């Protein structure tokens, strides 16, 4: 609540995407989510970051159908956030995968969501 009400100077925040697209993360930095009054709570852009340059890259990316061009624009938007030092990334999740040749039906996806009910192992030769 203190974060949403801009009553803290420093805090840790985590975000997990619910769909695999850069928009899901970069949307957090769009100035359209910054309220006019500092006392008004905001959930999405709790950083209260405003950048016309970022917004333009982001808005253009959202409107772009070409995936390569869209990713280029998202990269520029991301770099703008980095250049403006809006956040300080200090922690990244570590994800695990089962990649042994005897593992079967182990799902791999960018969202790190897995259903292991169909996973099985086949005997390895020589063991």
Description of each model-found segment:
Residues 9-25, 61-67, 116-122:
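A broadly tuned preference for mixed-charge, low-complexity surface segments
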Residues 1-34, 81:
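Pocket-flanking alpha-helical
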Residues 21-25, 52-60, 69-76, 80-83:
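Extracytoplasmic/secreted proteins, especially bacterial periplasmic and envelope-associated proteins
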Residues 11-14, 64-101:
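Bilobed periplasmic-binding protein-like "clamshell/Venus-flytrap" ligand-binding domains
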Residues 2-6, 27-59, 92-127:
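Short, solvent-exposed loop/beta-turn-alpha elements that line the ligand-binding surface or hinge
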Residues 19, 44-47, 64, 81-82, ...:
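Alpha-helical interaction segments
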């Amino acid at each position: 609540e203190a974060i949403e009400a801009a009553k803290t100077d420093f805090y840790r925040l985590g975000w997990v995407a619910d769909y695999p697209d850069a928009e899901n993360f970069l949307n957090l930095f769009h100035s359209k989510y910054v309220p006019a009054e500092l006392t008004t709570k905001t959930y999405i852009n709790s950083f209260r970051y405003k950048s016309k340059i970022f917004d333009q890259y982001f808005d253009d990316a959202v409107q772009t159908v070409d995936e390569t061009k869209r990713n280029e624009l998202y990269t520029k938007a991301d770099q703008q956030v980095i250049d403006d030092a809006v956040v300080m990334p200090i922690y990244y999740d570590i994800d695990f995968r089962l990649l042994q040749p005897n593992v079967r039906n182990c799902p791999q996806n960018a969202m790190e969501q897995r259903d292991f009910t169909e996973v099985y192992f086949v005997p390895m030769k020589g063991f």
